[in-house]
Amino acid sequence: MAGPKLDGAGNAKLATLESALTQLQRVHGVVEQCAVAVKGQQPASTFVPQIRRATQPMVGLLKGQFGMISDQVASFLLAATRGGGNDHTRVRILREGVVQLRVQLELAVAKTHELHTIDDAHEGPAARGTSS
């Protein structure tokens, strides 16, 4: 059974959110690789450029339709690229940032479904197959 029908704006927003979730999975993978390296006493700084490259496109992708989430991604990027401090603390901050972004994106998907679902009652008699 197919999911609920969405209007055009809802489909566009969902496509944007799905793309952002896919990119976030890539960021999460890099963060977890960083965590494994830090656990093995290797520096986390070698993973910062990878995180930056994986995160920067998300800012532009989300800016048009989801500005507040885009600002959160930019904040995550700032926290990821900030120098100094303990590598274990950096990994913790990166993991928390990934979780926050995932929650916001999933909430945006749910809200998009809620706001852009097309009801059969609003489609008119021709769409339902009845005639007046």
Language model region names:
Residues 34-54:
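Alpha-helical segments in soluble extracytoplasmic regions
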Residues 47-50, 61-79, 93:
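Short, well-ordered alpha-helical segments
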Residues 32, 39, 56-59, 63, ...:
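Alpha-helical repeat scaffolds in large eukaryotic proteins
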Residues 12-19, 39-43, 59-64:
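A ubiquitous short alpha-helical element
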Residues 56-57, 74-82, 96-100:
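Hydrophobic alpha-helical segments of small multi-pass membrane proteins
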Residues 1-34, 85-132:
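Amphipathic, coiled-coil-like alpha-helical segments
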